[in-house]
Every structure is written in C-alpha cells, then in structure tokens.
C-alpha cells in the first residue's frame, strides 16, 4: 500500500509540472522579435533615398513652404519655418502657423545657427535648390528632402505633391489624417465640377496665370498640364488651353502679353497680389485690350493668396476661389 501511495504522489507531481508548462505565458516561449519587427520603427523614402527613424518624429523644421503646409494639413505645427512672413502673405489656407513657430531665414538660405539652437528631430525640405545645403544641415539633424525634381515628379506635380504629403504624414505618424485630407480635396473637385457645369459658361477651356509686375512690366506664369493647378482645375471639369508646351519643372511657362495672346480664346483665371498694379498698368495697353478674354469679359479673379505650388490646403483654396469666381 505504501508503494502505491508513493507512485500516486510521483504521478501527481509530474502531471502538475506538465500543466504548469502548458500555462506558461506566451512571451516565455515565443521567438524573440527580429530587428525588422521593432515596434514603432519608420522607414521613409525621399528624393535621395531611404531614411529610418525609431518612431514618429515631433520637432520638425520645415525649410520649404510646402512642408509647413503638409504638416498643418495633418494637424502638426512645425517648430520652425523659413520666411514666415512670406508664407503668411502668399499661402492662404484655412490653417495658420502658431505664433510660437520660429522664422529661420529664407528658403534659399536658411539660418543654420538658428536651426541648430532649436535642436530639431528632423529638417525637411525639397530636392533641387535645397540639396546644396545638405552638408551643413546634416550636422544638426537628419535631413529629409522630398522629391520635386525627378522626371516622374515633374511629369505629374499633383501626384508628386500627394506622395510628399504621405511621406511627411508617415514621418510624424499621421497617415490617416493625410488620406482624409486627400479625400476631402477629391470630393471638393467633384462638387465644384457639378456647380461649374450648371453655370453654363461660354467655354470650359481655361488659362490660369499667376501674374505680377516686374519693373512695371507685366509677366504671366501660365500653368501647363503637368502642374498641380492644371490637374485640380481639370478635376473641376475644365480643360487647359495650353497643350503645346513640354512639361516644365515648376509647371509653368513665363509669357508677356504677346505670349498670352496665343491662348486668348479661353477663360482667363488669374491670381495677382493686391498691392500689384498689374491690371491698372495694362488698362491703356491696346494689345491687351484687344484680347478675346478681355473683350468678352472672360477674366476671373481667383484671389490674391492662392499658392500655386502648394499642397492639399492650397488646393482647397484654389477650388473654392475658382468655383466662386466662375459661378457667381
């Protein structure tokens, strides 16, 4: 009997031990996560290559206005922006830079010392003219330069702009906010198209210009089909009159009055700064006054603050202003 009891006791101990192993927490038996599975790690691709960060970044210095706008579009305030005064003058959007945002010089020549004082997590700009600054900026923090100059980016500036928005959103952990902003723009284009069609305009062909005076001489930036502006207006049901130009790096050609005459049988949609006397100076210009869109009252003001090189918030301003101008 004593032997039987001893055997039963040994069997019970073995059974309890097996059950304890079965109930062990999963993290004691699971494989260790690989480096690629590290929680929170972010890899983004910019115009120069890949960058890996340990998670969403918080202190961002935007040395290009588009970057500042992209951050605002996803609900993030940059630590600093180049030429804040210029941004506020030229970029009319429904989000504002906070008063705490530091001005760090010009886009073409950022103040390196001021940026260093801010101890940013990342400095974000664009390829092209800002690449020359890379060696100095990289001494301060990692630098991301969004693609703006590749053949692919130039061929479709609208698509490139959305890609750059998504990159910035990924950098700060705001991907859902970026997609919501893109959807909002697409919905507004469709809504505006319906309203413009109902307006029964004389034509749906357009020329869009950012015009300005240079030494009292009028100059017109005419936006080509590869531009963000053209894509948005075509999304509103309009057709770009300019079809005879190659893709330009910034999506426009520069013309004088004689150059504009090549596209005169169209809606002439313009953005001009309020303090620019351009149209006043043109009032006595016979060549200007004889243009089809002048004679037939087909000139439409898109407002003075449309940033024609902007991101989704500028697109919304463009849609709203053009829709109002064409349908009132």
Where are the regions a protein language model picked out?
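Proline-aspartate-enriched helix->loop->beta-strand connector
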Residues: 119-124, 142, 260, 265-266
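Short helix-initiation/N-cap motifs at beta->coil->alpha
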Residues: 46-48, 103-112, 247-257
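Alpha-helical, coiled-coil/dimerization segments enriched in small aliphatic residues
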Residues: 85-90, 218-251
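Structured C-terminal subdomain patch of bacterial secreted/periplasmic proteins
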Residues: 160-163, 262-328
């Amino acid at each position: 009997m004593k032997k039987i009891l001893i055997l039963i006791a040994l069997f019970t101990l073995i059974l309890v031990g097996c059950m304890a192993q079965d109930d062990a927490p999963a993290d004691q038996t699971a494989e260790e996560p690989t480096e690629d599975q590290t929680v929170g790690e972010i890899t983004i691709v910019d115009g120069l290559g890949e960058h890996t960060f340990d998670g969403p970044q918080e202190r961002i210095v935007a040395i290009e206005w588009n970057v500042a706008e992209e951050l605002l579009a996803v609900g993030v305030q940059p630590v600093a922006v180049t030429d804040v005064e210029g941004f506020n003058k030229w970029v009319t959007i429904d989000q504002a830079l906070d008063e705490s945002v530091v001005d760090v010089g010009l886009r073409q020549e950022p103040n390196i010392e001021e940026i260093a004082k801010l101890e940013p997590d990342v400095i974000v700009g664009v390829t092209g003219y800002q690449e020359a600054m890379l060696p100095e900026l990289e001494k301060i923090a990692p630098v991301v330069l969004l693609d703006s100059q590749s053949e692919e980016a130039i061929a479709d500036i609208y698509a490139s702009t959305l890609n750059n928005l998504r990159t910035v959103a990924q950098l700060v952990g705001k991907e859902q906010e970026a997609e919501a902003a893109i959807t909002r723009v697409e919905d507004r284009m469709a809504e505006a198209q319906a309203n413009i069609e109902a307006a029964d305009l004389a034509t749906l062909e357009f020329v869009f210009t950012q015009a300005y005076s240079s030494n009292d001489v009028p100059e017109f930036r005419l936006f080509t089909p590869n531009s963000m502006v053209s894509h948005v207006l075509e999304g509103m049901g309009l057709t770009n009159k300019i079809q005879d130009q190659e893709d330009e790096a910034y999506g426009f050609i520069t013309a004088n009055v004689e150059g504009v005459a090549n596209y005169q049988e169209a809606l002439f949609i313009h953005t001009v700064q309020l303090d620019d006397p351009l149209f006043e100076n043109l009032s006595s210009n016979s060549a200007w006054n004889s243009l089809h869109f002048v004679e037939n009252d087909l000139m439409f003001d898109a407002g003075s603050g449309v940033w024609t090189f902007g991101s989704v918030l500028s697109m919304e301003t463009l849609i709203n202003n053009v829709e109002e101008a064409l349908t009132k």
